[in-house]
UniProtKB/Swiss-Prot annotation:
The modification N6-(pyridoxal phosphate)lysine is found at K268. Its cofactor is pyridoxal 5'-phosphate. Belongs to the class-III pyridoxal-phosphate-dependent aminotransferase family. HemL subfamily. Pathway: Porphyrin-containing compound metabolism; protoporphyrin-IX biosynthesis; 5-aminolevulinate from L-glutamyl-tRNA(Glu): step 2/2. This is Glutamate-1-semialdehyde 2,1-aminomutase 1. Its EC number is 5.4.3.8. It is an enzyme of class 5 (isomerase). It comes from Listeria welshimeri serovar 6b (strain ATCC 35897 / DSM 20650 / CCUG 15529 / CIP 8149 / NCTC 11857 / SLCC 5334 / V8). PROSITE patterns: AA_TRANSFER_CLASS_3. It comes from the Bacteria.
Amino acid sequence: MLNYSKSEKAFKEAKKVLPGGVNSPVRAFNSVDATPVFMDHGKGAYITDIDGNEYIDYVLSWGPLILGHANPSVVDAITKAAMKGTSFGTPTEIETELAKLVIERVPSIEIVRMVSSGTEATMSAIRLARGYTKREKILKFEGSYHGHGDSLLIKAGSGVATLGLPDSPGVTKGLAADTITVPYNDVEGAKLAFEKYGEEIAAVIVEPVAGNMGVVPPIEGFLEGLRDLTTKYGALLIFDEVMTGFRVDYYSAQGYYVVTPDITCLGKVIGGGLPVGAYGGKKEIMEQIAPAGSIYQAGTLSGNPLAMNAGFETVRQLTPQHYDVFRSLIKRMEEGLTEISTRREVPISINKAGSMFGFFFTDQKVINFDTAKTSNLEFFRNYYREMLNQGIFLPPSQFEGVFISTMHTEKEIDKTLEAFDHTCKTLRG
């Protein structure tokens, strides 16, 4: 049993000054009935807490750290930029350089606007879609998280295509009424929604690989079907690649699945661990944004030079060969988890995409939020705490994706599988 006494003390202090003791809800460890671990430093594939416990890190700051912790080139880029000044509120050349790199790698993007978070990117993309199409309704998918913008915090009702209800106090019924929600991977549900509301729908926003119900890839024909529907009805297709951008493939998820959206939202990896977001797309659409056009969006720290330098250095280092290694390592993980769970009689369903994967304690194939919710959450809670005590740091929620970095090797995968085997043996008796 690891010692967490310093983290426990730090959490008590944090709760005096922060809501729930954290600055983002999942960090509170509520879903695993544990005290959150306070981190001190990270290096490569490892992270160390304030009690001195070292873990193999599969959270990687919720995805951004694709090169691992404290990558020397990224740290050097940030340090050099900071020595020149942390922010100017004016254009800098590094903004243009990162924009060129993003445009080169992401098939749908001809022009890109930098912002400060993934939430800001999706909120701005929705406003752009509404302004461009002169329509108001948005279609999203149940269980998909697109940041905490009011228009997107909507819970699905019953039926195939139901106008939503607010999923958080403070979200107005008026905003909820403009958001249509259908199950993920359900093209027929989307078709019915368009048949009923097609002339009112400004855009469909979708994660090409869902990452906030666990990792759920698109079934064959799903993304293609959405592309066809939006084109037919004159709506825009928005890919939320905040999580999947540069995670699923060298050319992001849209390059891997060969489906081109009208607007793409990015974040996480393109900031190299610093706060950043971006949205981009076709020139004729993006030039509607001020000051080129009349659709307003602005930000004090948009294009912050520290984030731009960190992002540029991160994306610059990635090569197609990295993704071959990612897939090989995750295949090794999948095969090991499958063998152990079969031997230990633990039902498991595994999904993967590039450098992301997810697993659910269920015998059902997980293709949407309903099937994701069949996972045994009580088993997950116990499993999580046991894995943590063996030095494996995983997302403290069943419904979050798991990530690897260029610093993860077969050594880390095999150690994780050993811990998984021990955990299953312990929990199954």
